[in-house]
Amino acid sequence: SFTLFYYKFMQNNERNDEHFWSHNQGTPLYYNWCGLAFERVCLTHINQIKSALGINGIICNAYSWKSITSTDKTNKGSQIDLVIERDDNVIDLCEIKYTKEKFTIDSTYNDIIQNKKVRFIQEHKTSKAIHLILISANSVCMNEYSEEFQKIIYSDSLFETETLRI
């Protein structure tokens, strides 16, 4: 993880600014790092995500997915942060979102998500049920577009521990 962080964000510190990271807080570089770091946290907390979805007892295969990139501008490639393919014939397509403030899903973002879903179905040729899941670092503004998601999971769910029931 540190090596990835270094080559992506610190290698360009040409002036050897010892406060490089502090000086870059609030910049696009900083928020890009926050988004990638939040994705990595989510990918290491699959069991907690399954718990939040209520699918603890279901065998699942979890992975990230990227479509075949097209050179056709009308048929853009897509990427899904986390796919949870379940043994109960459901596939959860998880969008992992880091924002500093409350996240609002607008029509443009909704179109992007729907395109990802369509591309995934086309390329996998699946007849399984597809659920859209949003995993958000912060709160989400509830509106007509947020209702497209089967479930919204917040970052605090990633750090809950299961209690053993006897």
What do the predicted segments below correspond to?
Residues 126-166:
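Domain-level recognition of nuclease-like catalytic cores that cleave nucleotide substrates
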Residues 46, 80-100, 113-114, 132:
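Conserved catalytic cores of phosphodiester-cleaving nucleases, focusing on short active-site segments
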Residues 12-16, 54-58, 73-76, 90-95, ...:
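Extended hydrophobic-aromatic, low-complexity segments
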Residues 44, 54, 115-124:
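Acidic, metal/cofactor-coordinating or nucleic-acid-engaging core segments within structured domains
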Residues 1-80:
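Accessory nucleic acid-recognition modules appended to NTPase machines
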Residues 99-119:
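Mg2+/Mn2+-dependent nuclease catalytic core
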